[in-house]
Amino acid sequence: MRRTPLYESHVSLGAKMIDFAGWEMPLQYTSINDEVATVRKNVALFDVSHMGEIFVEGEDTVEFVDYLLTNSFKNLRIGQVMYTVMCNEMGGIIDDLLTYRFGEKQAMLVVNAANIEKDFDWIVNQSKQFNVTVRNLSDQYGLIAVQGPLSERFLKTFVSDIDSLSYYTFASYSVFGKNCIVSRTGYTGEDGFEIYCHWDDTFTVWNELLQRGNNFGVKPAGLGARDVCRLEASYMLYGNDMDETTTPLEVGLSWVVKFDKDFIGKDSLIKQKELGLQKRIRGLEISDRRIARHGMYVFKGEKRVGVVTSGTFSPTLEKPVALAMLSSEIKISDEIEVDIRGSKVKAMIVKLPFYRGSVKSS
């Protein structure tokens, strides 16, 4: 199992460690609910160094990345970040990712940890007709997410001009004397920043953040809290809510699909749009405190209408919530049932997101 540069710190902080995509990662330090509360009310630090960084460089960078991804990279300004998906020819989602535009000839694609090798191979294979070089530099970067409504106020105490960074933009900063890329991005639904450090600098930056954060109430948070926060904010998780058998139109990501340009999978998505969706992701609020988990079936009367893709108890909303891939006949406010360990539990279809936090609008 692989370890991030912060492994020793996680162990010394008493983290419960788990295997996540072949990485030994912290699930929680204290309790998941406490860590979620820290994210929602103050500032939490996450180690997300297991994420992948793939660089595309060369004369055709803009043209190639624009073709590779569903969202419009050509329209992205230098210093901007873009959320997007990468599809196969059938419109199935290979991965969802963040794309950073460094210039006319360089882009960074930040991909999910479980998909690094798959994504890299796909990108290399698609690049052969373009004048670009594709490099997997995941081993050279650590990544720390600083998340919560007070993130800017905290970081401003040692990075003076951090408030000039608007939502979904990035810049180079000196953080505790280390050269870092900092973006105003995150996966929690709160305002926040992600700090890309050289692998060997990550431990120093993390430790300084923890020490400076002592008087600020800043605490580390694990993957458990990260998953609850993203689900409350209704952010999709690759491998649970979407994969190569689902399209961006089915999982509520039509806003990252730009049909006015060419991209891999465009023809298939146009056809799906014209024919109409057979299934789509919906939000569920469960009637009692039982949790609907991934893989549990959803019923409307006696008819099975779909399956739960993600579910948890939301400490912020004080009720269980879930995402489910359901037949398109199921609408907002419909009452349905989830088969939870052999008993059918009532639930209602609700509008997403479940929770809106302090995340800045673009």
UniProtKB/Swiss-Prot annotation:
GO molecular function term, any single one: transaminase activity
Catalytic reaction equation(s): N(6)-[(R)-S(8)-aminomethyldihydrolipoyl]-L-lysyl-[protein] + (6S)-5,6,7,8-tetrahydrofolate = N(6)-[(R)-dihydrolipoyl]-L-lysyl-[protein] + (6R)-5,10-methylene-5,6,7,8-tetrahydrofolate + NH4(+)
Record SUPFAM superfamilies: Aminomethyltransferase beta-barrel domain, Folate-binding domain
Gene coding for it: gcvT
Record flagged with keyword Transferase: yes
UniProt-listed GO biological process terms: glycine decarboxylation via glycine cleavage system
Species whose genome carries this gene: Pseudothermotoga lettingae (strain ATCC BAA-301 / DSM 14385 / NBRC 107922 / TMO)
Record note on quaternary structure: The glycine cleavage system is composed of four proteins: P, T, L and H.
PANTHER family in UniProt: AMINOMETHYLTRANSFERASE, AMINOMETHYLTRANSFERASE, MITOCHONDRIAL
Domain of life assignment: Bacteria
Keywords: Aminotransferase, Transferase
Function of the molecule: The glycine cleavage system catalyzes the degradation of glycine.
UniProt EC number: 2.1.2.10
Family indicated by similarity: Belongs to the GcvT family.
Record-given protein name: Aminomethyltransferase
The protein's enzyme class: transferase
Gene Ontology CC: cytosol; glycine cleavage complex
Pfam family, one: GCV_T_C
